[in-house]
């Protein structure tokens, strides 16, 4: 584990273990992402977005990734942009974020 990264993340997310765990998992999963796909990112509305229904309704030739974290605030999302958005290099982004 990258201790420096964890400490910065812990500070940015105010020690919220659930949010820290999700972002750490995203960081790992990003190693397997195919660039140029679709990304949903933001707070709980994105985390809980019915992506499977979206896929069923539209025959999309792209993969959809979800980087939603319930309870994310704007400042927390901004602090995690590298792992929740930039690392995926998406072609299309849907973002919804709280306060």
Describe each PLM feature range.
Residues 1-40, 46, 51-52, 56-60, ...:
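N-terminal secretory targeting modules
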Residues 71-72:
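Histidine-bearing beta->alpha loop at or near hydrolase active sites
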Residues 47-55, 59-65, 75-99:
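Oxyanion-hole/transition-state-stabilizing segment in secreted/luminal serine hydrolases
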């Amino acid at each position: 584990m990258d201790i420096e990264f964890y400490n910065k993340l812990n500070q940015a997310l105010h020690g919220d273990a659930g949010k820290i765990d999700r972002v750490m998992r995203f960081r790992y999963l990003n190693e397997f992402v195919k660039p140029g796909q679709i990304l949903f990112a933001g707070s709980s509305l994105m985390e809980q977005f019915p992506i499977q229904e979206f896929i069923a309704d539209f025959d999309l030739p792209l993969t959809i990734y979800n980087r939603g974290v319930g309870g994310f605030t704007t400042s927390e999302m901004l602090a995690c942009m590298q792992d929740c958005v930039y690392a995926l290099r998406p072609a299309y982004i849907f973002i919804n974020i709280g306060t």
